[in-house]
């Protein structure tokens, strides 16, 4: 399972309405879109994939262009799933001129 939480680090509040796309990275630099969801009022998407994950690489794309409060139009994170039975929580903290992400719990 992959989940996310998007926060406005400058104001200390969640960011609702952020479009997040999850894709699986396939051979030859192709991608297969798994889901496109929008963060809820608390800035969360509890489950980005309804299908079972496989070992491999995935891409999270956060579309920030509608926010108006950040320099970044979008943020793309490529991550590795080593164990599909584990949960992968990937928060994104957005500031006017910077972004931070990490593997949460």
Predicted regions: what they are:
Residues 1-83, 89-91:
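Beta-strand-dominated extracellular/periplasmic modules and repeats
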Residues 87-105:
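Compositionally biased low-complexity segments at domain edges in trafficked proteins
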């Amino acid at each position: 399972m992959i989940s996310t939480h998007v926060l406005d680090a400058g104001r200390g509040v969640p960011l609702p309405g952020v479009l997040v796309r999850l894709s699986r990275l396939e051979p030859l630099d192709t991608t297969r879109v798994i889901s496109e969801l929008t963060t809820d009022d608390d800035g969360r998407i509890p489950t980005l994939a309804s299908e079972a994950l496989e070992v491999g690489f995935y891409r999270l794309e956060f579309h920030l262009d509608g926010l108006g409060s950040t320099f970044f139009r979008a943020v793309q994170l490529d991550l590795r799933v080593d164990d599909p039975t584990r949960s992968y929580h990937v928060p994104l903290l957005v500031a006017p001129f910077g972004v931070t992400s990490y593997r949460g719990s």
